[in-house]
Amino acid sequence: MASADELDRREREILRALVQDYIHTGEPVASQPLLSRHELEWSPATVRSVMADLEALGFLEKPHASSGRIPTERGYRLFVDTMLKVRPPSVADRDRIERLAQAAPDVSSLIEGTADLLHSLSHHAGVVTTPRPQADPVRQLEFVRLRENRVLVVFVSEAGIVTNKLVQLEFAMEPAELERAAAYLNEKLHARADAAELAALRAAILTDMRADQSALHDLLQKALVLAEQSFAGTGVEKVVMEGESSFLDAPEFSDVQKARALLRGFAEKDRILRVLDRVLTAQEVQIFIGAESEFATVPDVSVVAAPYGRGDRVLGTLAVVGPTRMNYARVIPLVDLTARQISRALAALSEGG
């Protein structure tokens, strides 16, 4: 099979025009409509012949014998890599992204708002991973007593990001006890590089409990329970998604079985994380087209993703997931700008926290 750089100018121009038309219409493209919409310098017979050649080379395919042609994943890849002209986000889009970055009161709101905004701007699914615990472990805890047995836990990460969690205890703790428990746990967190892992923290507390027979023993027991409830569910990278159902509006997913398979793919969070974690070492936007993404067991899905972080520390990934027929020229700069603005917002939140 010929490589992409072996295509001549005529083949490239016709492929570019056809991909643009298919992205716009969602309908297989025939030679005559292609000529009427583009200022191509060749005859209809020449265009038909070139389209047949591009099909033989694996860049186009015919979904039906009597229809026009559509791009294959290989055709999309060549288009994105060598023919695509991205355009900067509009002023309105920039304003919406900047407003979210400036207005989010905390990290959770920022992550959820980003997924929703990516969906709203792209009309595809917006996906954001929460900051990875291994990249940004907890280094300080604070406990705020709301009621006798209801405690607000404030986590401060190594990068300075602040998150909160409500914990319901089966016993009461006085403010002074909470203060002592926080001081004790923070000492353990600072003493070991891996102490943010619950297992290591628990082992350190149990060691102290076995060695201590004084009144402090009761506090250590409470601190252990408090730590376990505080860290429960925090050591796992999570995925926030908005707009998965937008796929159902695309003609490519009008088949019920195909749509169901796609939605099952969205439900497999581990699969999504594997895809997005591939972006963590990248310096810029990454585009996975069709089978490249391994996002789902169905074809026609692409992922446009970028890492976000604070300073030189990469914390997570954000992405737009849509049909391979997505408007890459618009989506790629949207993802890029959003990642940069969210990174700035995280820096501001950590400094403010």
Swiss-Prot record:
<keyword id="KW-0346">Stress response</keyword>
<dbReference type="InterPro" id="IPR036388">
    <property type="entry name" value="WH-like_DNA-bd_sf"/>
</dbReference>
<comment type="function">
    <text>Negative regulator of class I heat shock genes (grpE-dnaK-dnaJ and groELS operons). Prevents heat-shock induction of these operons.</text>
</comment>
<dbReference type="InterPro" id="IPR021153">
    <property type="entry name" value="HrcA_C"/>
</dbReference>
<dbReference type="InterPro" id="IPR002571">
    <property type="entry name" value="HrcA"/>
</dbReference>
<keyword id="KW-0678">Repressor</keyword>
<dbReference type="Pfam" id="PF01628">
    <property type="entry name" value="HrcA"/>
</dbReference>
<protein>
    <recommendedName>
        <fullName>Heat-inducible transcription repressor HrcA</fullName>
    </recommendedName>
</protein>
<dbReference type="Pfam" id="PF03444">
    <property type="entry name" value="HrcA_DNA-bdg"/>
</dbReference>
<dbReference type="InterPro" id="IPR029016">
    <property type="entry name" value="GAF-like_dom_sf"/>
</dbReference>
<dbReference type="InterPro" id="IPR005104">
    <property type="entry name" value="WHTH_HrcA_DNA-bd"/>
</dbReference>
<comment type="similarity">
    <text>Belongs to the HrcA family.</text>
</comment>
<dbReference type="GO" id="GO:0045892">
    <property type="term" value="P:negative regulation of DNA-templated transcription"/>
</dbReference>
<keyword id="KW-0805">Transcription regulation</keyword>
<dbReference type="GO" id="GO:0003677">
    <property type="term" value="F:DNA binding"/>
</dbReference>
<dbReference type="InterPro" id="IPR036390">
    <property type="entry name" value="WH_DNA-bd_sf"/>
</dbReference>
<keyword id="KW-0804">Transcription</keyword>
<dbReference type="InterPro" id="IPR023120">
    <property type="entry name" value="WHTH_transcript_rep_HrcA_IDD"/>
</dbReference>
